[in-house]
Amino acid sequence: MPEGDTVLQTAARLHEALAGQVLTRSDLRVPRFATADLTGRTVLDVTARGKHLLTRIEGGLTLHSHLRMDGSWRVYAPDERWRGGPGHQIRAILGNAEHTAVGYRLPVLELLRTSEESRAVGHLGPDLLGPDWDPGLALDRLLAAPERPLGEALLDQRNLAGIGNVYKCELCFLARVTPWLPVGALPDGVLPRLVTLAERLLHANRDRPTRTTTITSELRTPPGPDTSPAPSPGPAAARSRTRPPVRVRERLYVYGRARRPCLRCGTPIRLADQDDRPTYWCPGCQSGPTP
């Protein structure tokens, strides 16, 4: 699932393959821009803004794309087989003499003037991986709606840009609160530490091929107080007393681990929808309302 760190990696790959090169092939397979021809123009740079990709092209043009849930950009050598999906899922092709970038299943693809990029990304909050990162502004925006559930607030890119559903679940676990707890009900000091941890986690994963939240030094000081109850008697509790706090083979604490034992307390991880997103939490470690 693309989030701020993976989008940044995608931007870096596209920039390396396309920037400074003249396009010899251009194919935008969306009705509005199907006749647009970018061949002969030089790609200036490719940059990430939150979870958005901006490919800036000679002549004051920007190709704006968003991966959402399952979109992707792949880069291929001239003789390499395209393996990103069937041909009908291709939405964009940008090629030069050395590489071809192919966009698959792109739910958002538009060509706009570079001077009008704010139409696409001007609504975004501070970018967790960007030069404009401002934790104070992100905190203010989160606190502007204290009644809003924390999980929904973290996903709102107007508050802070770059968090997706995986990080939402993991951050709430690390804060020891459920995603349904209102922002204003968080214990004192937890939200600022959570915002700081979000930035640290995305930076820790920005160059990793596989995202993890369980084997990084950024987790040495958890953002929330330990409000988890003592484990109830039984096999799970016995296992939790001897289980190390982190097992290297597990990349994530809760996301994708429904019904499996919590890495901290052994309680089975729960799964429910929040705003149509699958949401994972540990009822033993995380306090707050649940569905």
Task: Give short role names for the model-derived ranges.
Residues 63-176, 182, 189, 194:
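Phosphate/anion-contacting hairpin/loop surfaces
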Residues 22-37, 47, 81, 142-291:
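Basic, nucleic-acid-binding surfaces and adjacent catalytic neighborhoods in DNA/RNA-processing proteins
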Residues 1-124, 283-291:
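Acidic, proline/glycine-enriched N-terminal capping motif
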